[in-house]
Amino acid sequence: MNHIRNFSIIAHIDHGKSTLADRIIQRCGGLQDREMSAQVLDSMDLEKERGITIKAQTAALKYKARDGQIYNLNLIDTPGHVDFSYEVSRSLSACEGALLVVDASQGVEAQTVANCYTALDLGVEVVPVLNKMDLPQADPENAKQEIEDVIGIDATDAIPCSAKTGMGIDEILEAVIARVPPPKGNPDGALRAMIIDSWYDAYVGVVMLVRVVDGRLAKGDRIKLMASEAMYNAEQLGVFTPHTEPRQSLEAGEVGFVIAGIKELQAARVGDTVTLIKPGTGGAAFTATQALPGFKEIQPQVFAGLYPTEASEYDSLRDALEKLKLNDASLHYEPEVSQALGFGFRCGFLGLLHMEIVQERLEREFDQDLITTAPSVVYEVLKADGEIIKVENPSKIPDAGRVTEIREPIVTVHLYMPQDYVGAVMTLANLKRGVQLNMAYHGKQVMLTYEMPLGEIVLDFFDKLKSVSRGYASMDYEFKEFRASDVVKVDILLNGEKVDALSIIVHRSQSAYRGRAVVAKMREIISRQQFDVAIQAAIGANIIARETIKALRKNVIAKCYGGDISRKRKLLEKQKAGKKRMKQIGSVEVPQEAFLAILQVEE
């Protein structure tokens, strides 16, 4: 066990994690040069295209160190984006060390800090690495200073490297061996292995990625998952060197995969503990009694309705969501019926990027045509009878008379940016009802801390932040509490009928403005009908904005040449009566764009 090192790489988006992982794999001979592709561990097309890492991947490598010993290194790649911080904490809890990669030309950014604190909380040894040293604008001294100021770990011996040219890779590997402690655990004890990740494979069923903590797991063993108490046979074991390499057994301290003929992913919950059942011996000596401390169940922060464009596609959408959930433990969904859109699902996501990626994967990998409603967050509603309910869907909030108060989720937001953009960012944060808590200067970087309602961030805060700071600002946020706030539900009515999927929750101070904006937008989108269509925005029974789409009408008096006015009036009255009848029975088609229009109402 002393020759095993488990480590992962943490960094902000685009600081070069995946390229560094490629170099390390190449240096340890995990892949021949001809198989080397950029970003080996990003296996999803979407990951390569967006240049981000979504799922954690692993590689088991052998490295001959300068002291002549051969070490087994397990590298676990982690995502850098704030929405996937959960994937990061899972990867880190399987490691003893982490390489903190900082772009020497950019310095410390928000997710670097967030992920680094996660690592320090889990007691992982952090080794700072300065990447992109080949760039002419690299400023290693400044970057070291920032690491010490902002994160507070000693960066005097930070390793300079360049993942692009391959400089400093050996130094990194030597540092991992020297500074990262070997795994602790009892190789002779009862088997305990933690599931770090699990995904579904069409041929073999569920594949579990496990980190063996105590004991050993051999091929053919009967295993039990402690949380669900389900039992299986370990049919195949192995490690990824990024390729799959079958093994006869996995020892304590190793990270590898187990295939046990599990049919549904719900059985192999991430964070569960795997242990042995020995046939015939009562299984006591080999079965662990105490599970490993797992992960906290992750709570989705952002909700949106996903509906199929054709009602007949409902079943295939459900299958697609089930399959996606196999690979993505943090996706939540439940069936929902909307009067406007028919049958669909209410889905919970970790954040906006996560939502976009789920939508894109549904459309790409599963060929779904989707209608998505505006994203919303969870509100706590204190009803007049004292009951507290959590509401994910704005249209489900009870009428104003039955509600004592609505509490909205407040998050603590950390914003990092160069000094020049502080003013613009502060203006933006105040617009979004942010309350400034703190402001700190670290060299040329400024860190602002705000409390903001999550509902304000969900719509477009991130995009706006990037545009006011020319892309230099970065952010991360964490949930703080639910707090009572003067928010109201704005309903959109078409000809007096509520369209439930268009309800939005906004702060009272912005309600009239948002109502007007949405109504005006809807007027542009809904096509003209044979009768007048009134589009109204209402808070309860109080109408705050209205637009009318005028009816298309035939010129009924074209056939009268001259003649009496009463003849013309008769025809016009007759037309009017017909339109009135039509309006009573006519229904208005709401096009798909209307649901997205709510998102694009400009501030």
From Swiss-Prot:
PROSITE patterns: G_TR_1 (PS00301), G_TR_2 (PS51722). It is a peripheral membrane protein. Residues 2-184 form the tr-type G domain. It is found in: Cell inner membrane. It catalyses: GTP + H2O = GDP + phosphate + H(+). GO terms for biological process: positive regulation of translation. Keywords: Cell inner membrane, Cell membrane, GTP-binding, Hydrolase, Membrane, Nucleotide-binding, Protein biosynthesis. Pfam families: EFG_C, GTP_EFTU, GTP_EFTU_D2, LepA_C. Coiled coil: none annotated. It is an enzyme of class 3 (hydrolase). One of its GO terms (cellular component) is plasma membrane. One of its GO terms (molecular function) is guanosine tetraphosphate binding. Signal peptide: none annotated. GTP binds at D14, H15, G16, K17, S18, T19, N131, K132, M133, D134. It comes from the Bacteria. Its EC number is 3.6.5.n1. Belongs to the TRAFAC class translation factor GTPase superfamily. Classic translation factor GTPase family. LepA subfamily. Required for accurate and efficient protein synthesis under certain stress conditions. May act as a fidelity factor of the translation reaction, by catalyzing a one-codon backward translocation of tRNAs on improperly translocated ribosomes. Back-translocation proceeds from a post-translocation (POST) complex to a pre-translocation (PRE) complex, thus giving elongation factor G a second chance to translocate the tRNAs correctly. Binds to ribosomes in a GTP-dependent manner. PANTHER family: TRANSLATION FACTOR GUF1 HOMOLOG, CHLOROPLASTIC, TRANSLATION FACTOR GUF1-RELATED. This is Elongation factor 4. The gene is lepA.
